[in-house]
Amino acid sequence: MTNVSIHPSVDDGVARGGAEDFQGGTLECHCASDKVTVEVSAQTAHNHACGCSKCWKPDGAKFSVVAVVPRDNVKVTAHPEKLKIVDEGATIQRHACTGCGVHLYGRIENKDHAFYGLDFVHTELSKQQGWSAPGFAAFVSSIIETGTPPEQMDGIRTRLTELGLPPYDCLSPALMDALSAHVARKKGLLH
């Protein structure tokens, strides 16, 4: 086994599967008091380790762990006044706590985007067990943009593979197919 730290929630192995009847839980920021809380009332999908430079990562982690859930199942339940969008120009509008910096959820507002209607959440912010498990790693090469030396990439890809997280330098094939099919439908090439 390769000794490379990916993310605290997967470094000791990925817990497989989520509870079939799991109906969500509460995400909490890291503030000591007056926590921002977000209720997620559904099971997540497409959970993955993400190496992009935009996603929130805990201290020392090379990757975030992030999943999607229908936006209608995401509701801020405490301290919405503490949330601020990190980058107004980004496709995913990441709502972060102004107190601790944790990203509570990300939302795509562009109705023409293939993933419109899905919110991005970090289930590690929840105390509840049963969330879907990470199944792949996306935007792996992007960790170089945040300071990882390129010569470490072979070891990182090896570690991701050992953890059962196939490494991609984009999204998983199923998600890339969904994006491409969305474009083809908009062009009238698919129905």
UniProtKB/Swiss-Prot annotation:
Name used for this protein in its record: Glutathione-dependent formaldehyde-activating enzyme
InterPro entries: CENP-V/GFA, Formald_GSH, Mss4-like_sf
PROSITE patterns: CENP_V_GFA
Family the UniProt entry places it in: Belongs to the Gfa family.
Protein function: Catalyzes the condensation of formaldehyde and glutathione to S-hydroxymethylglutathione.
EC supergroup of this enzyme: lyase
EC number: 4.4.1.22
Naturally occurring in which organism (per UniProt): Xanthomonas euvesicatoria pv. vesicatoria (strain 85-10)
Positions that bind Zn(2+) 1: C29, C31, C97, C100
Pathway named in the protein's UniProt entry: One-carbon metabolism; formaldehyde degradation; formate from formaldehyde (glutathione route): step 1/3
Gene Ontology terms: biological process: formaldehyde catabolic process
One Gene Ontology molecular-function label: S-(hydroxymethyl)glutathione synthase activity
Catalyzed chemical reaction(s): S-(hydroxymethyl)glutathione = glutathione + formaldehyde
SUPFAM superfamilies in the record: Mss4-like
